[in-house]
Amino acid sequence: MADFQEQLRQYRAQKRRKETVDNFKDKLRRFWMLGTGANKDTTIEVQQVPTKFEAISENSQDEAVTSSESELVPEEQPTRSTDHHHKENNCLKYTLWTVYLLFWITLYVIAIKLSFGLVFLMFSALFGIYFNTRTEPKKRNEMSAYSVFNKNCESIDGTLKAEQFEREIRYGSGSVR
């Protein structure tokens, strides 16, 4: 029983450490993006406000109520503040990427002056590939690039399958039709 408790304590400590590291990474990522990235944990709850018509029908179910149509239809409020915030966020994002691009061009010019232009360009390409490649596993029900273009996930003619590759290695290329 004590062994089980110890394993449970270790598991909880490991989860806390992982959560702390994930929080640190998230804060660091948001710091570098200067708050332009939306929080991944954002949840939006939609609550329906009862309309005047529903309130009237609940209060008097047996009575016939006569009222004008303007009382029954709720007034709609335009959501311009969210549109404005979205446009402002996009403007900040594009400005930030422009600053990043200008900074990269400046560093590239300095590298050219120091005769390291090609090296800088290669390292920039490697960093770009690394930071734009996802290393965590695919989320549940997430479309993969393969399934986007191949709806039924069938084998595409002309592609090398793992089974075919294994047969060719074991028995030679004549074993495959």
UniProtKB/Swiss-Prot annotation:
GO terms for biological process: protein quality control for misfolded or incompletely synthesized proteins. Residues 1-100, 122-177 are cytoplasmic. Residues 57-70 have a biased composition (Polar residues). Its main location: endoplasmic reticulum. The gene is Saysd1. Ufmylation 'reader' component of a translocation-associated quality control pathway, a mechanism that takes place when a ribosome has stalled during translation, and which is required to degrade clogged substrates. Specifically recognizes and binds ufmylated ribosomes when a ribosome has stalled, promoting the transport of stalled nascent chain to lysosomes for degradation. It is found in: Endoplasmic reticulum membrane. InterPro entries: SAYSD1, SAYSvFN_dom. Residues 101-121 dip into the membrane without crossing it. Belongs to the SAYSD1 family. Keywords: Endoplasmic reticulum, Membrane. Residues 57-85 are annotated as: Disordered. One of its GO terms (cellular component) is endoplasmic reticulum membrane. The keyword Flavoprotein does not apply. This is SAYSvFN domain-containing protein 1. Disulfide bonds: none annotated. The keyword Ion transport does not apply.
